[in-house]
Amino acid sequence: MMQLMKITIKGNKLILDNDKIIYLTKEMFSKFDLKDKTSLDDETFYSLIYFRIKLSAYTMLAKRDYFKKELKNKLIEKIGFADIVKDVVEDFEEKGYLDDYEKAKSYAAQHSNYGTKKLSFILYQMGVDKEIVSEILEDEKDNQIEKIKQLWIKLGNKEYKKKIESILRKGFLYGDIKKAISSLEEEEE
């Protein structure tokens, strides 16, 4: 049995029973024939909310790239309806609009002064799969010593201990820092 959901439309706002407000576009009014409607069936309601979430997702993605989890959380926070947001995010992933692997690669390249430890922590927080993180950081591991050497030189005449602490905060491993320092000392001799 199909249930009808009571709605109120004021201007460009669709107000649900629970006082949740959905902002409507002119296209939504015509597509879903909303003029003078006081109720919606489940299927129409799902389609309407799906369409609204899709519009918001397009707008957000036009401004910048997002990780799947990041986009999903922002849409849920903005509009609600977690189950419908999940469907939209899956649809966008299938269409190639969301690609965690490419976004993670791009993020790692933009933050090249971070160590693998810090990058992996940030990427895990963003909801990137472990396989993707390990694959991306595998490429980064080879460059760690060189990055540390560059940072060490960049830090200049600062106190030895402070240089190490600064590099550790960027997510580099202590063992790698020691290797880089000894390598730099060997190069000086």
From Swiss-Prot:
InterPro entries: Regulatory_RecX (IPR003783), WH-like_DNA-bd_sf (IPR036388). It is found in: Cytoplasm. Keywords: Cytoplasm. Gene3D superfamilies: Winged helix-like DNA-binding domain superfamily/Winged helix DNA-binding domain. GO terms for cellular component: cytoplasm. It comes from the Bacteria. The keyword Signal does not apply. GO terms for biological process: regulation of DNA repair. Its main location: cytoplasm. Belongs to the RecX family. Modulates RecA activity. This is Regulatory protein RecX. It comes from Fusobacterium nucleatum subsp. nucleatum (strain ATCC 25586 / DSM 15643 / BCRC 10681 / CIP 101130 / JCM 8532 / KCTC 2640 / LMG 13131 / VPI 4355).
